[in-house]
Amino acid sequence: MLVHLFRVGIRGGPVPRWSLQSLRFQTFSAARSSDDQFSSCLLRAVAQLRSQLRAHLPRSPPASHRSTSAWCWVGGTLVVPAVLWQHPRFCLIALCEAKGSPPAQPTRARELRFKWKLFWHFLHPHLLALGLAIVLALGAALVNVQIPLLLGQLVEIVAKYTREHVGSFVSESRRLSIQLLLLYGVQGLLTFGYLVLLSHMGERMAMDMRKALFSSLLRQDIAFFDAKKTGQLVSRLTTDVQEFKSSFKLVISQGLRSSTQVIGSLMTLSILSPRLTLMLAVVTPALMGVGTLMGSGLRKLSRQCQEQIARATGVADEALGSVRTVRAFAMEKREEERYQAELESCCCKAEELGRGIALFQGLSNIAFNCMVLGTLFIGGSLVAGQQLKGGDLMSFLVASQTVQRSMASLSVLFGQVVRGLSAGARVFEYMSLSPVIPLTGGYSIPSKDLRGSITFQNVSFSYPCRPGFNVLKNFTLKLPPGKIVALVGQSGGGKTTVASLLERFYDPTAGVVTLDGHDLRTLDPSWLRGQVIGFISQEPVLFATTIMENIRFGKLDASDEEVYTAARKANAHEFISSFPDGYSTVVGERGTTLSGGQKQRLAIARALIKRPTVLILDEATSALDAESERIVQEALDRASAGRTVLVIAHRLSTVRAAHSIIVMANGQVCEAGTHEELLQKGGLYAELIRRQALDASLPSAPPAEKPEDHRSCQ
């Protein structure tokens, strides 16, 4: 086709009165080959490419009725490949539009913005302390501005005494010396005052921000935690808040003071020598402009550095939190390498940021020193011409040094402020998030009317982190009040998802889940989880506190007697009493000092203490040995009496007594019935029973192959 296009161009292009459409048809027809589909797509892409080029190139005047012969085609043949080489997106857009599909847009990282309204919310309670700190800082700055004037007068006395040798130097300089000492003392007191106030205010603000951020994180949807790493969240609670607090304190303690000193010293300089001050006025705006340009790049680097720190923290948190798994697989070296890789990347980002800040400060110091040198040169010329006193030049030099130090401090502060604003934006990002599923609000069914009847009606669901994959598909299930319903099936079939929807960790994408005829979305989630549903998982999580507090976690206002009763029902009272500290025994992080069966019984007691109407057992005994399973199963049987129970089981021997057994596969109900009914059907459930029995009789046999889903899912 390209050869044909070049040939047509050499011939001179379209003749008069030929439409562009006819030329395109002629050219496209000549380009047809045996690969008709490829040629058609490519030709349409060329047509769209021409439109894209027209849209991006400047408009030209309407062409005459005669085309510009071969030169247009030759030029196009030479230019278009170069354009495509430099701008391949033209070709991508043309090809996608030729196929009828939109081009993929490049994903851009969303830039975080500092939320001043939220910042004001935390600053408002401390306005009085802030105002007083600002007054003290301004006072200290104004005192600093007065010091160069007194030093200049003192230098004049020294020069006069050196020239004339008249009078007493001590008597003439006593007054100025006392004034300077008083100013130094006042400056120290003012500095002490505003630093104490800023420290108090900064720590209080940081505490309030951490409380608000932690509260916001706890209120987020479970889907939020599916997509975020714990280490990154902890990093925002600690590192980012600390960075922001430090920056805020520096802005007041150094930024405000340095800015005031710069302004006051410049006013003093303009009074001492307008000519020298004019030189500074010309140079200073140029320096500020350069600093502003460099600041945007430093902010971006700072944000990337903090994000990398959060990733490194996430790796460390994951490894340390799962240290037993790491040790069991001898993967210490691999985790070290993972963490080292993240640290290397973090170090590179931090070094790049440090080089940027160092470049900024280095250029600032060079510029300021050149300003001092220029001041000495021009000021010396003025003194030689008797247009300026020596003492005034000394005052000017000291004041200009004050300006230099203050602006150097501002340059250092600039990098800190950049990091602080970026850290604050990251903190406020999560603080301003609103969960899709609120923690509170909605209808609470009176206890006298609560029966525990649960219905899943045509429910479909996909996890927010995997929106294109349906875990449940038109799933329908009814849990009668006071009955035990068991969900069995292969892993990944959607059993645990059913429990998550029942606890309203997520909302279904289609269909409805009801409790006693009420849509769960209309009920108070806090009431539903706190009083109606008790949840016991395969891996119970205990907190690093006493056994008493872990059981009371299910009902904070429970009395000691209620805790003892719940422990007895869970078959836990006996082993708890055998500990030297009894119920005051600290279980360690995640209950590491207890066995699996002991942790499971504490989890049962924690669920029973709130007297739930509905009980969810998510493979509660699958990770236990035979003896522990027997003890725990006794407790579960006792806990299930009179309650609506949803059992998720892998060991089918534990669900034989269920009133109804639901066999799930691929997010759908394949079979339903009692144990005997399902065995008589000879379907998927019977196959699972047969394979588990075979595995039990052959303990050394390899894992059985998974049965095919289509056996009973017609």
Curated annotation (Swiss-Prot):
MF annotations from Gene Ontology: ABC-type transporter activity; ATP binding; ATP hydrolysis activity; ATPase-coupled transmembrane transporter activity
Binding site for ATP: 489-496
Segments traversing the membrane: 127-147, 178-198, 278-298, 365-385
A Pfam family annotated for this UniProt entry: ABC_membrane
GO cellular component term, pick one: nucleoplasm
Membrane topology: Multi-pass membrane protein
Domain ABC transmembrane type-1: 132-419
Keyword Zinc-finger in annotation: no
Ways its activity is controlled: Channel activity inhibited by ATP via ABCB8/MITOSUR subunit.
Superkingdom of the organism of origin: Eukaryota
Transit peptide (residue range): 1-25
Gene3D superfamilies: ABC transporter type 1, transmembrane domain, P-loop containing nucleotide triphosphate hydrolases
Gene Ontology terms: biological process: cell volume homeostasis; mitochondrial potassium ion transmembrane transport; potassium ion transmembrane transport; transmembrane transport
Domain ABC transporter: 454-691
Task of the protein: ATP-binding subunit of the mitochondrial ATP-gated potassium channel (mitoK(ATP)). v. An increase in ATP intracellular levels closes the channel, inhibiting K(+) transport, whereas a decrease in ATP levels enhances K(+) uptake in the mitochondrial matrix. Plays a role in mitochondrial iron transport. Required for maintenance of normal cardiac function, possibly by influencing mitochondrial iron export and regulating the maturation of cytosolic iron sulfur cluster-containing enzymes.
Subunit structure: The mitochondrial potassium channel (mitoK(ATP)) is composed of 4 subunits of CCDC51/MITOK and 4 subunits of ABCB8/MITOSUR. Physically interacts with PAAT. Interacts with Neuropilin-1 (NRP1) in mitochondria.
Protein name: Mitochondrial potassium channel ATP-binding subunit
Natural source organism: Rattus norvegicus (Rat)
Taxonomic lineage of the native organism: Eukaryota, Metazoa, Chordata, Craniata, Vertebrata
